């Protein structure tokens, strides 16, 4: 066994690139600390000034923060604003011919949308929604769409007329779609006939038909269909209408609706512990302000930058860093249809080269997969345009971080390892690329104005090196405002467990460790923490250690009941290059992985079971379905919805291995 040097690598400090830092918005740690001090000195003044300077208001707000009905906080009270106006109209004077969106379809089609073109298309779409479908301010519109430019038109058209959009990821099942439609009581559903994935048509309209059959969603009056792959689909007379046939008859002038700062902008449903999805409700002004500020601070976005976030718009990352953040800044955002692996694993690197991408934001899962499937693929492309790299969605292990830093960033790009959630609206903890010394797999410090702390259950601060609960102890503008239609669930979910100075604080649900320098490392969900003989061990920490073995391409660890220890560790391991091992080799490999764990974490962290599998079950957003793996490890029947999986055959292959081992 050749245990790599990642343990030492993880301790290494990387300072920002000097040339980049000189021109960055926040150039050094002194400037960062000045901003933090400014926010701490006068919290409301800090946020109020940012809102005045960065957003365009129809009517100024008269109160920065209203905490009278905490935790239902109100920001920028009585201000009037429109998000669509801030993302498009205000840029037209100086940037009407600037590219707003670059789109690349999976079949090789290509589209460039200027801000002037975006303005025209959004206005026509907004008029279509108003005039033909009677969509009004406050109505909910479900968007069940793939990654195409029309999806952005739909989002911004809704915001222009004051409708509340709720995007449902295009990989969700008809049942999941139905649940979200009914919870939101949506008036209109927008979808596409289909899209393209891995070179083949992938149909969406049949899922909508199934969701709506037998009047299962009585609030829905009409459905609007965008033709993308032009395959034969069934239409329901009187309900289904074709966007492409109607939109060009509409005027390209549509005055933006004056919205209150606190008017809901969108709902985005997340998984809930009860099984019922939670409709996370975000406001207009506060959300947009933080989307713009984090683009400026975390990505140091510049006028000529081409920004590429690989997330789907069905997730919060796609909302904030594909659409609203880049467009609020007047930047150019890239949209990609399809997968990273079609036609080959060089697709992303070719795009970075071809479109001269400056700032690149993706998930650790994608990085690990690209590393495993095409470790040397990036060397075939010119990636010199890159200035900042970012990761999102889960903790990134040092092995993946190192490859990303060295091979993609050429050891010159800061990696902004961002921590945030659907509920936070935007980044909460992150390095600043021109200022923050970074460490592999460390989210580093809270952003200015954000009070993130690691606390014990009794509200006391943890000591350096101790694991605790990551909390946010003061309200911030982009925070979740409510769970749609369920105030009690909002309080129970986020403001009912940990108190500081007698007041409940926002509980993120993530575990974290803070070091003596204040740097925060995310351990993972607190429900992804395994209690082994009284010792709380984060599965992400175990996965990071196992991944250091030279034969391990990827792994996922879950806790299983153990009569002696309470819980044991069960690992699903994907070997590099599809390698296989016999019984003797597998026992030796288990021994070697446990040696790494004893060195990295301690002898208490020991794998009890290992299953070598061809792949891990992942959603189309790249998230590993750990609950599913836990059911398999515990030999329970699978009850999870598999419709969101990238490849359901992976589960079948794992189950066949289980049957062989029984």
Curated annotation (Swiss-Prot):
Determine if Acetylation is one of this entry's keywords: yes
Q: Which positions does UniProt annotate for ATP binding? A: 393-395, 417-422, 510, 525, 536
| Keywords annotated in UniProt | Acetylation, ATP-binding, Ligase, Magnesium, Metal-binding, Nucleotide-binding
Q: Which organism is it from?
A: Helicobacter pylori (strain G27)
Q: What does this protein do?
A: Catalyzes the conversion of acetate into acetyl-CoA (AcCoA), an essential intermediate at the junction of anabolic and catabolic pathways. AcsA undergoes a two-step reaction. In the first half reaction, AcsA combines acetate with ATP to form acetyl-adenylate (AcAMP) intermediate. In the second half reaction, it can then transfer the acetyl group from AcAMP to the sulfhydryl group of CoA, forming the product AcCoA.
Q: Which reaction does it catalyse?
A: acetate + ATP + CoA = acetyl-CoA + AMP + diphosphate
Q: Write down the Gene3D superfamilies for this protein, in alphabetical order.
A: 3.30.300.30, N-terminal domain of ligase-like
Q: Which cofactor does it need?
A: Mg(2+)
Q: How is it modified after translation?
A: Acetylated. Deacetylation by the SIR2-homolog deacetylase activates the enzyme.
Q: Where does CoA bind?
A: 197-200, 317, 533
Q: Which residues of this UniProt protein bind Mg(2+)?
A: 549, 552
What is an example of a Pfam family matching this protein? AMP-binding_C
Entry-annotated residues carrying N6-acetyllysine: 623
Which BP terms from GO are recorded?
A: acetyl-CoA biosynthetic process from acetate
Keyword Ribosomal protein in annotation: no
Could you tell me which PANTHER family the record lists for this protein? ACETYL-COENZYME A SYNTHETASE, ACETYL-COENZYME A SYNTHETASE 1
Q: Any idea of its EC number? A: 6.2.1.1
**Annotated Gene Ontology cellular component terms:** cytosol
What is this protein called in UniProt? Acetyl-coenzyme A synthetase
Family statement drawn from the similarity comment of this UniProt entry: Belongs to the ATP-dependent AMP-binding enzyme family.
- What molecular function terms (GO) are annotated for this protein? acetate-CoA ligase activity; AMP binding; ATP binding; metal ion binding
């Amino acid at each position: 066994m050749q245990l790599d040097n990642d343990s030492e690598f993880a301790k290494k400090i990387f300072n920002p690139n000097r040339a980049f830092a000189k021109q960055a918005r926040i150039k050094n740690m002194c400037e960062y600390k000045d901003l933090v001090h400014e926010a701490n000195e006068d919290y409301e003044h800090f946020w109020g000034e940012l809102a005045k300077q960065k957003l365009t208001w129809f009517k100024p707000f008269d109160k920065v923060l209203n905490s009278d009905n905490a935790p239902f906080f109100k920001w920028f009270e009585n201000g009037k604003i429109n998000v669509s106006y801030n993302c498009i109209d205000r840029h037209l004077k100086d940037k009407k011919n600037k590219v707003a969106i670059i789109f690349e379809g999976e079949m090789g089609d290509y589209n460039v949308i200027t801000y002037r073109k975006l303005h025209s298309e959004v206005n026509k779409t907004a008029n279509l929604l108003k005039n033909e479908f009677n969509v009004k301010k406050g109505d909910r519109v479900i968007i069940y769409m793939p990654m195409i430019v029309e999806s952005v038109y739909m989002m911004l058209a809704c915001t222009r007329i004051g409708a509340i959009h709720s995007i449902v990821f295009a990989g969700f099942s008809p049942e999941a779609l139905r649940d979200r439609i009914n919870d939101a009581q949506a008036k209109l559903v927008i979808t596409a006939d289909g899209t393209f994935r891995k070179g083949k048509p992938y149909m969406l309209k049949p899922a909508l038909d199934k969701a709506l059959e037998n009047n299962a969603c009585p609030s829905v009056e009409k459905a609007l269909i965008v033709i993308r792959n032009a395959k034969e689909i069934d239409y329901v007379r009187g309900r289904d209408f074709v966007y492409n046939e109607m939109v060009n008859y509409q005027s390209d002038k549509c005055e933006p609706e004056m919205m209150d700062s606190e008017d809901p902008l969108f709902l985005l449903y997340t998984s809930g512990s009860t099984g019922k999805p939670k409709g996370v409700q975000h406001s207009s002004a506060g959300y947009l302000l933080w989307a713009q500020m984090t683009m400026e601070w975390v990505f140091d976005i510049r006028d000529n930058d081409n920004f590429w976030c690989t997330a789907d718009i069905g997730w919060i990352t796609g909302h904030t860093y594909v659409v609203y953040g880049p467009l609020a800044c007047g930047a150019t955002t890239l949209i990609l249809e399809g997968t990273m692996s079609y036609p080959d694993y060089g697709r992303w690197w070719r795009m970075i080269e071809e479109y001269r991408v400056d700032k690149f934001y993706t998930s650790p899962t994608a990085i690990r997969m690209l590393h495993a499937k095409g470790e040397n693929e990036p060397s075939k492309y010119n990636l010199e345009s890159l200035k900042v790299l970012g990761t999102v969605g889960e903790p990134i292990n040092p092995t993946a971080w190192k490859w990303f830093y060295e091979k993609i960033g050429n050891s010159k790009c800061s990696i902004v390892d961002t921590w945030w959630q659907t509920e936070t609206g935007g980044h909460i903890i992150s390095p600043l690329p021109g200022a923050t010394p970074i460490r592999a797999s460390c989210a580093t410090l809270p952003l200015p104005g954000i009070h993130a702390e690691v606390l014990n259950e009794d509200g006391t601060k943890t000591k350096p090196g101790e694991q605790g609960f990551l909390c946010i102890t003061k309200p911030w503008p982009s925070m979740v405002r409510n769970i749609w239609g369920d105030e009690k669930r909002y309080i129970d979910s986020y403001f009912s467990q940990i108190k500081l100075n007698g007041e409940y604080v926002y509980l993120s649900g993530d575990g974290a460790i803070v070091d003596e320098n204040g740097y925060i490392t995310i351990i993972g969900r607190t429900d992804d923490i395994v209690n082994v003989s009284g010792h709380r061990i984060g599965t992400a920490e175990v996965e990071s250690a196992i991944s250091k073995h030279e034969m391990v391409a990827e792994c996922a660890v879950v806790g299983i009941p153990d009569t002696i220890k309470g819980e044991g560790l069960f690992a699903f391991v994907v070997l590099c290059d599809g390698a296989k091992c016999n019984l003797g080799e597998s026992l030796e490999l288990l021994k070697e992985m446990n040696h790494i764990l004893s060195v990295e974490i301690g002898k208490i962290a020991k794998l009890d079971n290992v299953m070598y599998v061809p792949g891990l079950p992942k959603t189309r957003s790249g998230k590993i379905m750990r609950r599913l793996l836990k059911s398999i490890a515990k030999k329970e029947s699978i009850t999870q919805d598999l419709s969101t999986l990238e490849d359901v055959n992976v589960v079948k292959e794992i189950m066949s291995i289980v049957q062989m081992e029984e």
